[in-house]
From Swiss-Prot:
Its EC number is 3.4.24.18. Residues 66-712 are extracellular. CDD domains: EGF_CA, MAM, MATH_Meprin_Alpha, ZnMc_meprin. It comes from Homo sapiens. Residues 434-593 form the MATH domain. The lineage of its organism: Eukaryota, Metazoa, Chordata, Craniata, Vertebrata. Residues 66-260 form the Peptidase M12A domain. Residues 642-663 are annotated as: Disordered. Its main location: membrane. Residues 741-746 are cytoplasmic. PANTHER family: DISCOIDIN, CUB, EGF, LAMININ , AND ZINC METALLOPROTEASE DOMAIN CONTAINING (PTHR10127), MEPRIN A SUBUNIT ALPHA (PTHR10127:SF824). This is Meprin A subunit alpha.
Length: 746
């Protein structure tokens, strides 16, 4: 009966091999924190909850209102500012982060207050609001509870710079529909338009993507029905974006202040022009870099990724011929820094021998005025990954300099490619501390269920703290969204570091890979670690304590990770696919973790006058007052008793030409997305702002996952019991057969 024994051994070998290969997914019921303790809200929601009824929702006006057209309301740069100490530490850090966006993308600059008569003081009042233009006194911007997000702060600063909301333009009704009967009673004034005596479009088109545009559900009665929709339905998911400035926002800002230069962008090159951005070839090297286009088979640039015929250029250094150690130099023009630190970002790929090298150098002033002193900064080695990669190199130049790329051949006989460069950006900003690239993200998104997660590598900040991010491609809490969360990791420096680690600001960014950094609309979130971040899962201990004490051990990093703290609705899948977030199907995540304890006390005494919120105009009762000779109607405000006083409702006539109530005018928001129920397997459909979100059922043995509850999975413990029980029965059966087969025949 040797064949029976062999069969048994083979069967169980295959059985246990199969069990080891089957991925048993388990969704841990851990305590999940949300950085803002709930869903991120927009300005109108925050101000409504605070009981505020302001002009256009978030603007305070003086009695003698000056409009955007008045040149006397223009600021002189840099704008003096004060961060009041009633602001939270996280809000202060977020404001400074927003300042950097203005400096990088526009001519706007800020400086600490030093006794000037005109300045902005950022304070925490109720809600998010600002005044419009320079009032020539100290004036307020409120960053209240829930307002400490980069895009919201940028929005309020744009008001202070002189901008009203996009949908207040005179020609608004040509581009969007206002559904007056869906607006909260008494808040219709927020949707008024204003004539050219108050607002100018600066000769730019209507901008659906403007940071100053209302969101579809602003001031709505019904949570699932919008108040404003685009006449081109494709823009309904775009209006009210809260990522960053749009290209037209920046164009208007530059036109208003008659400037085009930025403060922290030193150099930028996509190699689309024949002059290769003023870069020069080395004269003492062995060969040159070649300016190539994407027309050749298999050669695709990073800027356009081969999407445009006859366009898409890059620099290439071939390493497939010649001799080992032959090199080529590519040098930038001479650059003049204003700060003491720069970040050189570029995309590169190496398709030749693993021994090929790409070296970044700087050429400095030799103290005689000649830029000739060479210093090696960083080396990149060839490998088996032939994809485009992002790189960051920290430079610390205080005088004029050039940066150089040196390509060196490693083993030409075993090379079939070379070294490629594209999309170079040099800024006077810090480089991101942690950079994580998730490749083939569309496939990752398709193959993961709600709650499945990916862990980043461990990064270290300048203090020596280990940290990382957790990516949930399909957020368990918010259907159709991606979740990102932060954690600290145990590391080699833990014994000498301070625990719990508090007052460190976390900035997580999903990179919009638009080649021009000024036009990037990356998605960023911030929070600051605090002793108030505790968890019942660890006996209400601070989650930022030493990870080896309060964290969980993970074999992939051979380290302990703390509980995650993050955002369940970091960015929607729809938005991810809209811009260049997934260029080359790569999701690129930046994460920073820096000490901002020094911002604890920032308020300074002031001189002269400062506006008080109680002395300003809110949206009051309105009277139609005809302007002589214009036939236009303007609003007359009345001063309320207090800042939070509500206003009486009024009847508002509908705008003309909004169109009949037909299907082509009413987007999907107006149809109940849960009728019919799109959820499978008895899933419950919930209408979340006009979008269907499925709540999948879960039993003792099985649970359903997927965006429509279409996938069934078995709880890991039950599956183990089933497999173990089945294996036991089979083993017992074969054992009985083997015993019976060995009994002597009569």
């Amino acid at each position: 009966m040797a064949w029976i024994r062999s069969t048994c051994i083979l069967f169980f070998t295959l059985l246990f091999a199969h069990i080891a290969a089957v991925p048993i997914k388990y969704l841990p019921e851990e305590n999940v924190h949300d950085a803002d303790f709930g869903e991120q809200k927009d300005i109108s929601e925050i101000n409504l909850a605070a009981g505020l009824d302001l002009f256009q929702g978030d603007i305070l006006l003086q009695k003698s209102r000056n409009g955007l057209r008045d040149p006397n309301t223009r600021w002189t740069f840099p704008i003096p500012y004060i961060l009041a100490d009633n602001l939270g530490l996280n809000a202060k850090g977020a404001i400074l982060y927003a300042f950097e966006m203005f400096r990088l993308k526009s001519c706007v600059d800020f400086k600490p207050y030093e006794g000037e008569s005109s300045y902005i003081i950022f304070q925490q009042f109720d809600g998010c609001w600002s005044e419009v233009g320079d009032q020539h006194v100290g004036q307020n911007i409120s960053i209240g509870q829930g307002c400490a997000y980069k895009a919201i702060i940028e929005h309020e600063i744009l008001h202070a710079l002189g901008f009203y909301h996009e949908q207040s333009r005179t020609d608004r009704d040509d581009y969007v529909n206002i559904w007056w009967d869906q607006i909260l009673s008494g808040y219709q004034h927020n949707f008024d338009t204003y004539d050219d005596s108050l607002i100018t479009d600066l000769n730019t088109p209507y901008d659906y993507e403007s940071l100053m545009h209302y969101q579809p559900f602003s001031f709505n009665k019904n949570a699932s029905v919008p108040t404003i929709t685009a006449k081109i339905p494709e823009f309904n998911s775009i209006i009210g974006q809260r990522l960053d400035f749009s290209a037209i926002d920046l164009e208007r800002l530059n036109r208003m202040y008659n400037c085009t230069t930025t403060h922290t962008l030193l150099d930028h090159c996509t190699f689309e022009k024949a002059n290769i951005c003023g870069m020069i070839q080395g004269t003492r090297d062995d060969t040159d870099w070649a300016h190539q286009d994407s027309a050749q088979a298999g050669e695709v640039d990073h800027t356009l990724l081969g999407q445009c015929t006859g366009a898409g250029y890059f620099m290439q250094f071939s390493t497939s011929s010649g001799s080992a150690e032959e090199a080529a130099l590519l040098e930038s023009r001479i650059l003049y820094p204003k700060r003491k630190q720069q970040c050189l970002q570029f995309f590169y790929k190496m398709t030749g021998s693993p021994s090929d090298r790409l070296v970044v150098w700087v050429r400095r002033d030799d103290s005689t005025g000649n830029v000739r002193k060479l210093v090696k900064v960083q080396t990149f080695q060839g490998d088996d990954d032939h994809n485009w990669k992002i790189a960051h190199v920290v430079l610390k130049e205080e005088q004029k300099f050039r940066y150089l790329f040196q390509g060196t051949k490693g083993d030409p006989q075993n090379s079939t490619g070379g070294i490629y460069l594209d999309d170079i950006t040099l800024t006077e900003t810090p480089c991101p501390t942690g950079v994580w690239t998730v490749r083939n993200f569309s496939q990752v998104l398709e193959n993961t269920s709600k709650g499945d997660k990916l862990q980043s590598p461990r990064f270290y900040n300048s203090e020596g703290y280990g940290f990382g991010v957790t990516l949930y491609p399909n957020s368990r809490e918010s259907s159709g969204y991606l979740r990102l969360a932060f954690h600290v990791c145990s590391g080699e420096n833990d014994a000498i570091l301070e625990w719990p680690v508090e007052n460190r600001q976390v900035i997580i960014t999903i990179l919009d890979q638009e080649p021009d950094v000024r036009n990037r609309m990356s998605s960023s979130m911030v929070f600051t670690t605090s002793k108030s971040h505790t968890s019942p899962a660890i006996n209400d201990t601070v989650i930022w304590d030493r990870p080896s004490r309060v964290g969980t051990y993970h074999t992939d990093c051979n380290c302990f990770r703390s509980i995650d703290l993050g955002w369940s609705g970091f960015i929607s899948h729809q938005m991810l696919k809209r811009r260049s977030f997934l260029k080359n199907d790569d999701l690129i995540i930046f994460v920073d973790f820096e000490d901002i304890t020094h911002l604890s006390q920032t308020e300074v005494p002031t001189k002269g006058k400062r506006l008080s919120p109680q002395g300003l105009i809110l949206q009051g009762q309105e009277q139609q007052v005809s302007e002589e000779g214009s036939g236009k109607a303007m609003l007359e405000e009345a001063l309320p008793v207090s800042l939070s006083q509500g206003q009486p409702s009024r009847q508002k006539r509908s705008v003309e030409n909004t169109g009949p109530l037909e299907d082509h005018n009413w987007p999907q928001y107006f149809r109940d997305p849960c009728d019919p129920n799109p959820c499978q397997n008895d899933g419950i459909c919930v209408n979340v702002k006009g979008m269907a979100s499925c709540r999948c059922i879960s039993g003792h043995a099985f649970f359903y996952t997927g965006e429509r509850c279409q996938a069934v999975q078995v709880h890991g413990s039950v599956l183990g019991m089933v497999i173990g029980g089945t294996a036991g029965v089979i083993f017992l059966t074969f054992s009985i057969i083997a015993i019976l087969s060995q009994r002597p025949r009569k």
